[in-house]
Amino acid sequence: MLGKLEELIGKICSDTSVAKADFQQGYGYGYSFSNYNTDFFTAWEMSGYYRFSWSERHPSEQFTMDTRNETLASYVLVTQVGALRRARLRQRPIVIPGEAPSPQQWTIADTRWPRVKRYTSTTDPTMVVESVNSLELRQTLFATQFPLEDYVDSFMDPDANPVLSPYLSSVEPHLERLRDAGVKLPTDDSY
């Protein structure tokens, strides 16, 4: 199953040193990604599901999100590994909004696990994900409004074109607040 996403993974990791390590600890087969051996993102397949987890110190088998839908899995991979790619290439980060999903776009149902909900697309009932209500989930659901190919291309492009340029972050507002507070910065004439 994860083999279907190999080409996508290869494209996102191309021309970078984003580490892709095999992950197989009795929890299925997959990959763990990191930039500097911190902040691991792990993707694996198990029993017909794509599963995803995030952890700080080492890859974790405690999944936060799972889906059977290849397209939804692709959006998760692009968002998470694409962010690692941009950081490694020292490109401006893309800040994907993390608002709660709209009831017009996603239905939310309880599962047998207390903190886990099932999110189903109202336009494509095959797009189903079970997850805790995490920022990563909300970013993934937001991302599905864009065509997948355009979404991938935006993470590959330094200016985040064609669809994500409005979500590029900037340090300028932070620097302006520092200047307003009287902090002299190296770029100031009077530094």
Short names for language-model regions:
Residues 1-49:
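N-terminal "first-domain core" detector
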Residues 3, 7-18, 78, 82, ...:
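Generic surface-pattern signal
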Residues 30-32, 40-42, 51-53, 76, ...:
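Ordered hydrophobic segments in well-structured contexts
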Residues 34-62, 174-187:
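Short aromatic-glycine-(Arg/Gly/Cys) micro-motifs in beta-strand/loop hairpins
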Residues 58-69, 129:
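A short, exposed loop/beta-hairpin motif centered on an aromatic-Gly-Thr core
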Residues 68-81, 137-148:
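A short, charged, amphipathic alpha-helix used as a generic interaction element across diverse proteins
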Residues 78-103:
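Short arginine-rich
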Residues 99-191:
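Intrinsically disordered, low-complexity, charge-dense segments enriched in Lys/Arg
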